[in-house]
A protein has these predicted regions:
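Short hydrophobic core segments
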Residues: 5-7, 30, 132, 152-168, ...
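Feature captures the FAD/FMN-dependent oxidoreductase FAD-binding
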Residues: 76-157
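A glycine-rich dinucleotide-binding beta-alpha-beta segment and adjacent secondary-structure elements
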Residues: 127-129, 134, 305-385
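An anion/pyrophosphate-binding glycine-rich loop and adjacent beta-alpha core
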Residues: 34-36, 41-42, 50, 56-57, ...
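N-terminal Rossmann-like FAD-binding beta1-loop-alpha1 element of flavoenzymes
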Residues: 3-29, 403-407
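Glycine-rich active-site loop/strand segments that organize a redox cofactor
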Residues: 47-95
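Glycine-rich loop(s) and the adjacent beta-strand/alpha-helix scaffold that form part
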Residues: 157-203
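Glycine-rich FAD pyrophosphate-binding loop
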Residues: 21-45
Length: 407
């Protein structure tokens, strides 16, 4: 019987520990926090979006960070396996918009309880408040880890599942990346992924709190004509810039050392010609009104003063005096408001980290290190990341399962 130490008790670490124990290993799970799954507890706004019901083959379209590396993991331990894992314990799940799967209770604590119960059932020794402060090598293998700078724990095999560097208050402080580098692994550039964006346009703060639905955004690098990212959905203005599902997904394509613009199409369902006809119809209806009072049926009230300002049409101009050229400019504006990106919000605010242990140095079919023979990795510590929708938690569980299966 091997002794296995798993570092980090997020979903990846817990699944790795459960699976390693089922494979007849003596397993210790070390967690720096005072409880299991601290970051998992806040995912999905505390409801825990645990996976997605889309066909597993579709998952890769939602994984911008090294999707090919995850083929073995996601096909070995699928979303169906995740659903069966929890439902076999009596934890009911439900699917919502976009295929996102949540516990029926809407409580992330149920998901953590399910994992915790399996840890107990499989006799995993869980050590909370146990922060790994050093890893010791001997003859090219890990011999032991130091815990809380106080004592050493020896084992035959080790799994690092410490997460990235986003949400540091949950314990994701990058310790596992530091240890991995010490062990000879390359750490790819760390960037925030799924994070709000700060905008230079001063008027944005006047729209703070406004949510725009059914819009289209396109993100451009100023050096490239083709958009880096384009999608439709929901967006939120904040005091510093923009957020919401569309922006979080789009942030994956932005770095802090480039020049980017975000174009907003407020009416993606209408062509320029169709929008022009719609505006003419409204102008005919409000023929004797001032321009500022003619857009109520077309745009959110809070947005109208900004559109008027950007259109350079006098707010007091009668709509029957607005000429064709002005109307054309208004159409182009509504179909293409340009936001100038200042920077991404800090990595601490990101939902996940882009970057991590280089996937070229990990066997994708086992999660084993190609450098250290008694080491595997699982979860966000690896250079993989996905969009929101349950994909990141599924990746954590799938890589954890592979790592635990191959100790």
């Amino acid at each position: 019987m091997k002794k296995v130490i798993v570092i980090g008790a997020g979903p990846a670490g817990m699944m790795a520990a459960i699976t390693a124990s089922k494979n007849n290993n003596d397993v210790i799970l070390l967690e720096a926090n005072e409880k299991l799954g601290k970051k998992l507890f806040i995912t999905g706004k505390g409801r825990c979006n645990v996976t997605n019901i889309k066909d597993i083959s579709e998952f890769f379209d939602y994984i911008p960070g090294n999707p090919h590396f995850l083929y073995s993991a996601l096909y070995t331990y699928t979303n169906e396996d995740t659903i069966n894992f929890f439902e076999s314990q009596g934890i009911k799940l439900k699917a919502e918009r976009g295929g996102r799967v949540f516990p029926f209770s809407d409580k992330s604590s149920d998901i953590i309880k399910g994992l915790s119960n399996e840890l107990s059932k499989n006799n995993v020794e869980v050590k909370l408040n146990s922060k790994v402060t050093d890893i010791n090598l001997k003859e090219g293998k890990i011999e032991s880890v130091k815990v809380n700078d106080e004592y050493l724990l020896k084992a035959d095999y080790f799994i690092i599942a410490t997460g990235g560097v986003s949400y540091p208050l949950t314990g994701s402080k990058g310790d596992g990346l530091k240890f991995s580098k010490k062990l000879g692994h390359n750490i790819t550039e760390l960037n925030p992924s799924l994070v709000p964006i700060e905008i230079k346009n001063n008027w944005v703060k006047d729209l703070s709190g406004l949510t725009l639905k059914n819009i289209e955004i396109s993100i451009f690098d100023e050096k490239v004509k083709k958009p880096l990212y384009k999608d439709q959905g929901e967006m939120l203005f904040t005091s510093y810039g923009v957020s919401g599902p569309l922006i979080l997904k789009g942030s994956r394509y932005i770095t802090n050392n480039g020049n980017y613009n975000i174009n907003l199409d407020l009416k993606p369902a209408l062509s320029n010609e169709e929008l022009d006809k719609r505006i003419q119809k409204d102008f005919k209806k409000f023929i004797n009104k001032d321009f500022k009072n003619s857009l109520d049926e077309l745009l959110p009230k809070k947005l109208i003063p900004i559109i008027i300002e950007l259109s350079e049409i006098s707010e007091n101009k009668k709509v029957n005096e607005i000429i064709k050229e002005e109307r054309k400019n208004l159409v182009n504006l509504i179909k293409g408001i340009k936001l100038k990106v200042m920077k991404l919000r800090p990595i601490e605010e990101a939902i996940v980290t882009s970057g991590g242990v280089d996937t070229l140095e990990i066997d994708p079919s086992t999660m084993k290190s190609k450098i250290i023979s008694n080491l595997s990795f699982a979860g966000e510590v690896i250079d993989v990341d996905a969009f929101t929708g349950g994909y990141n938690v599924q990746i954590a569980l799938s890589t954890g399962f592979l790592a635990g299966s191959n100790t």
